[in-house]
């Protein structure tokens, strides 16, 4: 399971290690040839963080989010914590939160989560949180991997199976996220989030059938 998860979430971000190489690396400790240390650490860190989160039950917090991010990027990027400079997500064509307001927007997101965690279905709650996190883009690098790990944590914490965002469905995934961009940080209209929620629901079904059955 974890091999498929690590392969897909890192491949979405451009990691070129294929599934067989990922399996050999994580199961047998065999380092793939002609791959960068960054790509190798990327997979190893994902596996380590995933297993560490299975043992945790605490509520979302700035500390937990930063810890997940920093652990995912260990030996990859030395920049720790929320970013202090602006970024533009060119490939996705949207402007992230300006650096001076990252902490403020993350505060608002955590407050939104706390307010809605008892009145939204866990899949809907986790999906909307994931999107809003990605829209803020609070880190210099690793936002996608961190966001998908948080999505996984929120589902597992509520006794739901995790989701693979498959490499082959990357375009649909990113398109659904962009549709949801029309909602601001403290709101979540059904029209804006319907597609990404439906996408994640289908990915959950596919993950369950492909991995657990």
Each language-model region and where it sits:
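FIC/Doc superfamily catalytic core
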Residues: 1-213
């Amino acid at each position: 399971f974890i091999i498929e998860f690590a392969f897909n979430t890192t491949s979405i971000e451009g990691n070129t290690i294929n599934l067989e190489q990922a399996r050999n690396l994580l199961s047998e400790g065999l380092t793939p040839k002609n791959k960068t240390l960054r790509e190798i650490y990327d997979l190893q860190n994902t596996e380590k963080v995933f297993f560490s989160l299975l043992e945790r039950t605490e509520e979302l917090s700035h500390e937990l989010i930063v810890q997940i991010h920093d652990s995912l990027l260990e030996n990859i990027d030395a920049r720790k914590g929320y970013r202090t400079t602006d970024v533009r997500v060119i490939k996705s064509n949207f402007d992230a939160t300006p650096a001076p307001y990252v902490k403020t927007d993350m505060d608002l997101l955590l407050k939104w989560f706390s307010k809605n965690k008892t009145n939204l279905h866990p899949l809907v709650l986790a999906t909307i949180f994931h999107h809003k996190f990605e829209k803020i883009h609070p880190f210099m690098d690793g936002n996608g991997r961190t966001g998908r790990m948080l999505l996984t944590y929120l589902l597992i914490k509520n006794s739901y199976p995790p989701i693979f965002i498959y490499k082959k469905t990357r375009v649909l995934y990113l398109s659904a996220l962009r549709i949801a961009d029309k909602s601001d940080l403290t709101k979540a209209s059904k029209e804006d989030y319907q597609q990404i929620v439906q996408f994640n629901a289908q990915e959950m079904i596919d993950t369950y059938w492909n991995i657990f059955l």
